[in-house]
């Protein structure tokens, strides 16, 4: 199964899904031994001059037959408009799947079908099965840690992966969580205590757990995280909230990175993976994941250490142009230092797009000087002393 999509930048800096395709390749053991490719859906949409959407669905003959089913085309158009306005996928919407299922139910009411209608029904059933498989794959194997989850450590929380979602654990105090989070927290601590000492020497986690009742009178667990550091022959126990932001950030990502390292089907996306993490430590972790990880890791970062540990083909740079936001640096050789090339490109602007706005050190110095004079010119109001009675 192959799922493809085209992304179209908008004037307000967002991204529209302008085309989605789903193809099915037959097994090489079938037919003449060559994997025959079958297009189940090629859906393209664009915005016309008056703001109305123009769309096509291919193969045209089969989808034309499916659209002829009662209310099907109207439901497709409604979902196209909604998904376009919300900048999301049309194919993976619940409404699209519901419409396909309803179409199959309507067609199946007829005992005798024309050849084209029968072919359309068979394709529709294949598409329903494929979408279920892809949706299940995404729920089980794809995880996205946004800036919101990552930044939670700055506010005394650690993100924890729970099923296909993220929860946050308050680490600033003992907290009562639902009973079904017990295994998730225990797994997080266990994984951390295997990996943490290899990247942060002499550091482990400890979790105090006690039976409790939640605010809604359901079974819960009272949880308080601590860190344990070995200092000579002694162990020093401190609340986990007192650890550095980088350590808390790593603990929050460990379950995801562990899955990426071990599972070939895992696809993990992390926004600003470098936030608060010591750059040498970040580089060592990324190098191991790149060389030995079995899954796929997609991330954004500001730290240039990444350019020294990852192959250039795995890196895409952002630009200042909202209409052409990403590019690869040209002229990179095996012996090139990508970090030096990037810094030079920013300074002399030798790439097709500007990688970052150029900043004049002299103008920055002048601005600081002016800002300082503003403070000097600010005069505190004087308070008039009361007159004493003569």
Annotated model-derived regions:
Residues 1, 235, 338-340:
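Conserved nucleotide-sensing/catalytic segment adjacent to the nucleotide-binding pocket
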Residues 3-198:
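Electropositive, glycine-dotted interaction segments
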Residues 17-24, 221-231, 315-316:
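Short polybasic amphipathic segments
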Residues 202-222:
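Long, charged, glycine-rich C-terminal linkers/tails
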Residues 215, 219-258, 265-267, 273-277:
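Conserved ABC ATPase signature
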Residues 259-263, 290-293:
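Post-Walker A helix-loop "phosphate-sensing" segment adjacent to the P-loop in P-loop NTPases
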Residues 278-283:
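Short alpha-helix of the ABC ATPase nucleotide-binding domain corresponding to the H-loop/switch region
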Residues 284-390:
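C-terminal lobe/lid and adjacent interdomain/linker elements of RecA-like ASCE P-loop ATPase modules
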């Amino acid at each position: 199964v192959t799922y493809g999509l085209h992304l179209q930048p908008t004037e307000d800096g967002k991204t529209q899904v302008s085309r989605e395709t789903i193809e099915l390749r037959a097994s090489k053991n079938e037919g003449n031994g060559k994997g025959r490719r079958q297009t189940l859906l090629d859906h393209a949409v664009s915005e016309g001059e008056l703001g109305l959407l123009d769309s096509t669905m291919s193969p045209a003959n089969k989808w034309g037959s499916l659209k002829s089913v009662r209310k099907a085309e109207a439901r497709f158009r409604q979902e196209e408009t909604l998904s376009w306005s919300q900048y999301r996928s049309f194919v993976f919407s619940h409404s699209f799947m519901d419409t396909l299922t309803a179409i199959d139910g309507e067609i199946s009411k007829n005992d005798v079908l024309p050849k084209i209608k029968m072919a359309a029904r068979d394709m529709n059933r294949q598409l329903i099965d494929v979408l279920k498989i892809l949706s299940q794959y995404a729920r089980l194997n794809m995880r996205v840690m946004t800036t919101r989850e990552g930044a939670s450590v700055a506010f005394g929380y650690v993100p924890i992966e729970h099923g296909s979602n993220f929860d946050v654990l308050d680490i600033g105090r003992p907290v009562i969580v639902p009973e079904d989070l017990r295994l998730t927290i225990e797994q997080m601590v266990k994984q951390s205590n295997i990996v943490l000492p290899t990247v942060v020497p002499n550091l482990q986690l400890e979790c105090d757990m006690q039976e409790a009742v939640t605010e809604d009178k359901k079974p819960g667990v009272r949880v308080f995280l601590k860190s344990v550091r070995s200092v000579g022959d002694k162990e020093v126990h401190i609340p986990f909230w007192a650890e550095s932001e980088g350590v808390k950030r790593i603990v929050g990502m460990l379950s995801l990175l562990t899955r990426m390292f071990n599972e070939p089907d895992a696809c993990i996306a992390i926004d600003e993976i470098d936030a608060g993490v010591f750059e040498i430590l970040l580089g060592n972790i990324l190098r191991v994941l790149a060389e030995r990880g079995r899954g796929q890791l997609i991330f954004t970062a500001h730290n240039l250490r990444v350019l020294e540990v990852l192959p250039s083909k795995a890196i895409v740079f952002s630009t200042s142009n909202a209409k052409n936001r990403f590019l690869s640096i040209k002229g990179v050789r095996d012996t090139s230092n990508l970090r030096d090339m990037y810094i030079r490109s920013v300074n002399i602007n030798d790439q097709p797009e500007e990688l970052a706005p150029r900043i004049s050190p002299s103008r920055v110095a002048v601005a600081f000087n002016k800002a300082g004079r503003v403070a000097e010119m600010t005069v505190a109001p004087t308070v008039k002393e009361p007159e004493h009675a003569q």
